[in-house]
């Protein structure tokens, strides 16, 4: 049973922060572009966010920029201990995921 406490982060809170993350090429929020595929919040405060880009060959710098913005914004939420962001559907997804998710 999942019991929410005052310090537990919610999907709504994460989504609100993700609305601030803008695609560097198009200038639109990634939430408005429906690029976020999954938000998984664990009881221990770890968050897993899965997303995709608009095309499988978007420049990797865009993917890394989006990841850093996602992580910076969501890691500030009360109760968050760790944020892992996974890119999928990109030609270099494995390499990018290894580079942007330390440990």
Give residue spans per PLM region.
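Domain-level signature for proteins that mediate thiol-based redox and metal-cofactor handling
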Residues: 1-103
């Amino acid at each position: 049973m999942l019991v929410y406490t005052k310090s537990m982060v919610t999907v709504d809170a994460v989504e609100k922060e993700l609305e601030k993350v803008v695609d560097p090429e198009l200038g639109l929020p990634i939430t408005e572009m429906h690029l976020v595929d999954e938000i998984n919040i664990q009881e221990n405060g770890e968050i897993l966010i899965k997303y995709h880009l608009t095309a499988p060959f978007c420049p990797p710098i865009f993917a890394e920029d989006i990841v850093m913005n996602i992580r910076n914004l969501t890691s500030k939420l009360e109760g968050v201990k760790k944020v892992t962001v996974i890119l999928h559907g990109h030609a270099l997804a494995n390499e990018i995921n290894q580079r942007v998710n330390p440990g």
